[in-house]
């Protein structure tokens, strides 16, 4: 009964674009108008405002975490199924990528996906975060780190998530994140991808 409203609320939470919100708060340009044009922490970092980039990263991760945790806390009282929780997780990411509040022009979903995974399975999220950190510090390329961690996510989920529907949701999330990184993948192949913090 409450499955559809839960998914809708998760989508709306995911639609809060912290890259745009934080940038407006600090009087910065809209991140969709410079650099890669992506409203995410990496692009905000290109502005040179490290604090704004950090807040964007935390905000985008937090909304994924809150959306799914809220559903999990209310799962029993509202009678939500495990499949509904999986749908809520996916909806938070869809909201980030296609936000209703910002003309359906959103980010690539890495931070939000991490927040979602943290709510579903902290161990899975930790594995992905560690992989991201190792790749980011090793190669200084955010997209390469994100892509590697994204590919690892469904594999880690197979071992650490308790429900099949959550594993499939993680796979769907990974596919969406990879698709949103199409241009980054092409740039990596061509050797033209920007380093972390490098202005375009």
From Swiss-Prot:
Pfam assignment, any one: G3P_acyltransf
Coiled-coil intervals, chain numbering: none
Compartments reported by the entry: Cell inner membrane
InterPro entries cross-referenced by the UniProt entry: G3P_acylTferase_PlsY (IPR003811)
EC number(s) per entry: 2.3.1.275
GO molecular function, one term: acyl-phosphate glycerol-3-phosphate acyltransferase activity
Transmembrane segment boundaries: 2-22, 51-71, 84-104, 114-134, 158-178
Gene Ontology cellular-component annotations: plasma membrane
Keywords of this entry: Cell inner membrane, Cell membrane, Lipid biosynthesis, Lipid metabolism, Membrane, Phospholipid biosynthesis, Phospholipid metabolism, Transferase, Transmembrane, Transmembrane helix
Recorded catalytic activity of this chain's protein: an acyl phosphate + sn-glycerol 3-phosphate = a 1-acyl-sn-glycero-3-phosphate + phosphate
Keyword Cytoplasm: no
Pathway the protein acts in: Lipid metabolism; phospholipid metabolism
UniProt keyword Cell inner membrane present: yes
GO biological process: phospholipid biosynthetic process
Membrane topology: Multi-pass membrane protein
Main location group: membrane
Family: Belongs to the PlsY family.
Functional description taken from the UniProt entry: Catalyzes the transfer of an acyl group from acyl-phosphate (acyl-PO(4)) to glycerol-3-phosphate (G3P) to form lysophosphatidic acid (LPA). This enzyme utilizes acyl-phosphate as fatty acyl donor, but not acyl-CoA or acyl-ACP.
Record's subunit section: Probably interacts with PlsX.
Name this polypeptide is given: Glycerol-3-phosphate acyltransferase
Species the sequence originates in: Neisseria meningitidis serogroup A / serotype 4A (strain DSM 15465 / Z2491)
